Structure formats: structure tokens, C-alpha cells
């Protein structure tokens, strides 16, 4: 089986859940009529076994079997920590 595992990067927007967090993935889509590029956001719930991610972190996630009703992604690594103010 040579299926490639899907991985994406996004920014953590919520970490209030236990062993879970929510990320936002931004992409740019061209408007069909105006031709202008518009930002679109996708929110995903991610499984985080060790509660590593914090709000503002940039993380890499991969697709996995469904962990719950809304979670079918798991944390691979924290790419960049958020800047603490």
C-alpha cells in the first residue's frame, strides 16, 4: 500500500478541551466573478494525547482513524511555539 498520509499545518485557536485542541487552516480561493483572492478558513478538532499545543502555536497534524465524532486528526509536532507577551 503506497498511500501517502495527509498532513497539514495550522494555527491553534482553542486548547480548552482535555487531550484536544482546535486549529484553523487558512487558504486563499479566487472569487469566480471578481477574480480577487479571498481567505477561507477551515476549523478542525485534533487529538493531542500529551496536551502539548497552546493557543497561537503553529502545528503539523496528520489524518487518522476517527477518535471521536468530530476528531479524525492527530498531532504530529509543534512547528513553532507562540510568542508569549
Swiss-Prot record:
GO cellular component, one term: cytosolic small ribosomal subunit
Signal peptide: none
Keyword Ribosomal protein: yes
Gene3D superfamilies: Nucleic acid-binding proteins
Record's keyword terms, sorted: Ribonucleoprotein, Ribosomal protein, RNA-binding, rRNA-binding
InterPro entries documented for this protein: NA-bd_OB-fold (IPR012340), Ribosomal_uS17 (IPR000266), Ribosomal_uS17_bact/chlr (IPR019984), Ribosomal_uS17_CS (IPR019979)
UniProt name for this protein: Small ribosomal subunit protein uS17
UniProt-listed GO biological process terms: translation
Domain of life: Bacteria
Natural source organism: Mannheimia succiniciproducens (strain KCTC 0769BP / MBEL55E)
KW RNA-binding (keyword) present: yes
Entry's family note: Belongs to the universal ribosomal protein uS17 family.
GO-annotated molecular function: rRNA binding; structural constituent of ribosome
Quaternary structure (record): Part of the 30S ribosomal subunit.
Taxonomic lineage from the root: Bacteria, Pseudomonadati, Pseudomonadota, Gammaproteobacteria, Pasteurellales
Function: One of the primary rRNA binding proteins, it binds specifically to the 5'-end of 16S ribosomal RNA.
Amino acid at each position: 500500500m503506497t498511500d501517502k498520509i495527509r498532513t497539514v499545518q495550522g494555527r491553534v485557536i482553542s486548547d480548552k478541551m482535555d487531550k484536544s485542541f482546535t486549529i484553523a487552516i487558512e487558504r486563499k480561493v479566487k472569487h469566480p466573478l471578481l477574480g480577487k483572492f479571498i481567505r477561507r478558513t477551515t476549523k478542525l478538532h485534533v487529538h493531542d494525547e500529551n496536551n502539548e499545543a497552546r493557543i497561537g502555536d503553529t502545528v503539523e497534524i496528520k489524518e487518522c482513524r476517527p477518535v471521536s465524532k468530530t476528531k479524525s486528526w492527530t498531532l504530529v509536532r509543534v512547528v513553532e511555539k507562540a510568542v508569549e507577551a
